[in-house]
UniProtKB/Swiss-Prot annotation:
Phosphate binds at residues 88, 126-128. It comes from the Bacteria. Phosphorolytic 3'-5' exoribonuclease that plays an important role in tRNA 3'-end maturation. Removes nucleotide residues following the 3'-CCA terminus of tRNAs; can also add nucleotides to the ends of RNA molecules by using nucleoside diphosphates as substrates, but this may not be physiologically important. Probably plays a role in initiation of 16S rRNA degradation (leading to ribosome degradation) during starvation. This is Ribonuclease PH. Its EC number is 2.7.7.56. It catalyses: tRNA(n+1) + phosphate = tRNA(n) + a ribonucleoside 5'-diphosphate. One of its GO terms (biological process) is rRNA catabolic process.
């Protein structure tokens, strides 16, 4: 089989590195690297929930996505300087939030909020899928932090793992984890978010200048789910290590009558 320009097989992921505890202050902080794409994902815990959720007893999870000005070959102005977020930034932020909310029992958080921030340090395609995959690991660490602080009503609020990958048709062949060079000329481009229980959270697919048959869609999904299985294995391996920071001390146990 002819290999891709970067030497990979069609079903092969780029070299993947997940570094926990990348920064000190958030409850969860991860640097995830898919080849040359590098995204910092943090999960911060704050007391309280949005106004529309107050009094419900439920927690909330929100997400923001951004790219550093020099994340690509050509520097771009910060969106904060422009005074408004682009449609792309808003779309990806919402995608990350939806994806992570699919795996967590918000009732277990009480009225606390987990804010997930995904900042692209270097972009070479697949930034949104890398952000989701890394953000799940940061979220898992934030849950560990909340559990240690005694703030969870359920000690295991995560029902599954979440990962995402890009797939596409390039040069007539189905390929996974597209770098920018392949993404820019793909005949079909798709992002797939999945759970480690085999279900789908979201599928975003587009024919770039051409249509594609149902059979191609099925093959793309098969390739994406197989790639996600590898991502789940990498997440599990990363999370085997102890929590990378200092955990808070939970509230003291209630006194027993007569003690």
């Amino acid at each position: 089989m002819t290999r891709r320009e970067d030497g990979r097989l069609d079903d092969e992921l780029r070299p993947l590195v997940i570094t926990r505890g990348f920064t000190e202050h958030p409850a969860g902080s991860v640097l995830i690297e898919f080849g040359h794409t590098k995204v910092m994902c943090t999960a911060s815990v704050t007391e309280g929930v949005p106004r529309w959720r107050k009094g419900s007893g439920l927690g909330w999870l929100t997400a923001e996505y951004a790219m550093l000005p020099s994340a690509t070959h050509t520097r771009s102005d910060r969106e904060s300087v422009k005074g408004r977020l682009s449609g792309r930034t808003q779309e990806i932020s919402r995608l990350i939030g939806r994806s992570l909310r699919a795996c967590i029992d918000l009732a277990a958080l009480g009225e606390n909020t987990i804010a997930v921030d995904c900042d692209v340090l270097q972009a070479d395609g697949g930034t949104r899928t890398a952000a989701i995959t890394g953000a799940f690991v940061a979220l898992a660490d934030a849950v560990t932090y909340l559990s240690a602080a005694g703030k969870l009503s359920d000690p295991r609020p995560l029902s599954c793992a979440i990962a995402a990958v890009s797939v596409g048709v390039v040069d007539g062949r189905i390929r996974v984890d597209l770098p920018y060079e392949e993404d820019a000329r793909a005949e079909v481009d798709m992002n797939v978010v999945a759970t480690d229980t085999g279900t789908l959270v979201e599928v975003q697919g587009t024919g770039e200048g051409a249509t594609f048959p149902r059979s191609t869609l099925d093959k793309l999904l098969d390739a994406a789910l197989a790639a996600c299985d590898k991502l789940f294995a990498a997440q599990r391996e990363a999370l085997k290590l102890p929590y990378p920071g200092v955990l808070p001390e939970g509230p003291p146990p209630p006194k027993v009558f007569g003690s």
